[in-house]
Amino acid sequence: MFGALRFIATLQKLYPFWLTTETVKAKQEERFRALLAHAAQNSPYYRRKLAGLDLATCSLSDLPTLTKAEMMENYDDLVTDPRIKKADLSAFTHNLSNLGRLYLGRYGVSHTSGSQGQPALIVQDQDALALIFAVQFARATKLKRRFLPHLGRLINPARMAVMTVKPGFYPSAAAFAYRPKYLAPMFKVLRLSYSDPMETNIRKIENFRPDYITGYASALEALGREEENGRMKLRRLECLKQITNVAEPLSDTAGNWLESIFGAHVTDEYAMGECMVLTSGCIEGRGSHVNADLAILEVVDENNRPVPPGTEGSKVLVTNLYNYVQPIIRYEVDDRVTMSAAPCSCGSPLPHVAKIAGRTKDLLWIEQDGVRREVPYYVFLVPLHNVLDLAEHQIVQTGPRQFVVRLVPIKGKELDIEHIRLLMMKNVREEGLESHVDIEFQVTSAIPLGPSGKVIRVKNEYIQKKATQTEASVPEGAGI
């Protein structure tokens, strides 16, 4: 009970409309200085990197940046608990039965999906894990700020349906697997897999009667189509209050359509495994708000120079202000983000993210029994989760059933292609796609950059070729 009451008190403190821009900046500065001091004292990696800097006065731009490759290469020296070892964590995450079990009896463990290249291992303590839920409920839902409504969750818990890929150590699933036990009375969670039959998921959702649904844009749009076509009847149950999109961009058009279908507000969250509370979805409109008292988001150009609000950056630098176990400072992420130039109309003092373009991918598809079926990116991505010697990858559709998986090993490492092939085909078989796809594996030293100067990790060259052929076959002047 004490843990739940402490959590409710945290919700009150995090309520954004009690804050001002000045108090947010002051709290950010306080936590930033504390993080630097802790990292320099307890992390051999940061002790070297921050040597010679006055950590009480240096500016953010004085600090070195951190890439995923650098973090993974120096992992044992970067973490602040010397008992944490990269090799042990890798073995720990390879055993799915460890999901939800605290590493060293203290830490939650996850690995990033690898959608941004090489997977990264993440450890965080139980306070950080609880903060994920506190921030999202205090800032990304229309819960009232009064104490009693929060206390009422002990009697009438929030009902959350979460649609992810298969169970695993990727961040969204791990967050719920490591949810502190004292939160159990406040949150009833229905976990759904995007790979399960849609009719099964529909029945589970309707029986559960969720207040909130969270999922990838592609999964939410699939649910919307089921509701629109009458195969799901969630709206008439009058239970759904909010839909939250995570991990994939959701267009305004799609968001508005989902709102009209379900009669519930649709919000976006922009986050990553390295900083799960980076933003919270706006409770009134589109986009999300940076939790600037808990994280720093720098939108920069290719030379790490800040770009003004309203201008799309080439990448972002993320500083996590709450994870002292694995300090993540000015961490490079290959996302093209645009911050709002004007304050958000909702009145929040937190900075508003207007647009995220870096994770847009081509759609992959096959024809199955005469019906076109989308093949989600995760079908290829999940088997690559634990390939820690993988630096980069690209999935390319080259024909109606032909796919190429291009793999770049970390410099000085070799990839076990036969092992990767077995993992990939096992996943394809479990998805019921084995007789519908042909997969070729290519190991290469580099993947050509796209027009934006970034790696395009999912390409559908087949549909691009078909579109070009169609255009070429249209007579000149047709349609004018």
Feature map (PLM): residue ranges:
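AMP-binding/adenylate-forming
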Residues: D127-A130, Q136, R159-E221
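Conserved AMP-binding/adenylate-forming
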Residues: N245-P343
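Short, structured coil segments at secondary-structure junctions
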Residues: P185, C239, I261-H265
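Residue-level signal for inorganic ion chemistry
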Residues: A39, T112, M160, I213, ...
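AMP-binding/adenylate-forming catalytic core of the ANL superfamily
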Residues: I213, L317, Y322-G432
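Short hydrophobic/charged patches on amphipathic alpha-helices used for structural packing
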Residues: E199-I202, E206, M232, L381-L384
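Adenylate-forming
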Residues: S193-T200, P210-T253, T267-G273
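Nucleotide 5′-phosphate-binding alpha/beta core
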Residues: M1-H111, Q118-K142, L148-H150, I155-P157, ...
